[in-house]
Amino acid sequence: MIRNAKSFAIGLVLLLSFALCYIGMMSPNFGNGRNGLNYADDMFNSFSKGSSNFIKESTKIAQSQNGTNINLTIKASSAADAVKWGKLYTGAGATVTIKDSALTINGDFGRILNSVVTDSESMYNNDGKVVEKRYGYDPREAINNWNNSFKKIDSALKTKSQFKEEAALAKVVQKALEPGYNYYGVEIKKVSDNKSSLAFLLSFYLLYTVWYGFGLYYLFSGLGITVTKPKKKAEV
């Protein structure tokens, strides 16, 4: 039962307008079939990409391993994957022997890491065709194969107590390989060049949250549903 018609009307108007705004946000009218949430997500991904370029740092880490030889055997999930993994390491100048799904890799660890950084930089710059031309198959799959094979190499290096090499590997994965893969296809945008867009998105998010909250508040207030502190019982 409505207790306060004015409060109820305000709440109803706020919630109905909120619903209309939500429908508009979820419509695919924000370019390339995106809705408002997709647009905002892409915008923030572009901003974060602009501050996630660690290629120079990764190159220094890779170069610190130049002249360090590794000779180890890892196992892929299938013989077909082993062949694809092998293309990565032969491209980095290593000698690779494949037997079924097992690969024995013998080569300069610095050159291997430098190849990974080079591929990651190409992906970060949305130039996947270069990586595809280098190995002859999908660039995302190639980067994923680097990552999967590195997990095996990481375990092998730990087993051999080559902890310095393992640490360098982990840093290159974190600072080059992962950003290259995750941000592939994302446009780079700097916050300094898009201050107005960022301010609008943050302000709208705040307004949208308050908008919904006040709508509920006035609606329930109009229905007589309020939150009050319980009265203290008088002591006898």
Regions found by a protein language model. Give the residues of each.
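Juxtamembrane interface at the cytosolic side of transmembrane helices
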Residues: 1-8, 192-236
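Alpha-helical transmembrane signal-anchor/signal-peptide segments
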Residues: 26-56, 189-194
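Hydrophobic secretory-pathway targeting helix
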Residues: 1-39
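Soluble, non-membrane globular domain cores that form compact, hydrophobic packing
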Residues: 12-24, 161, 187-188, 207, ...
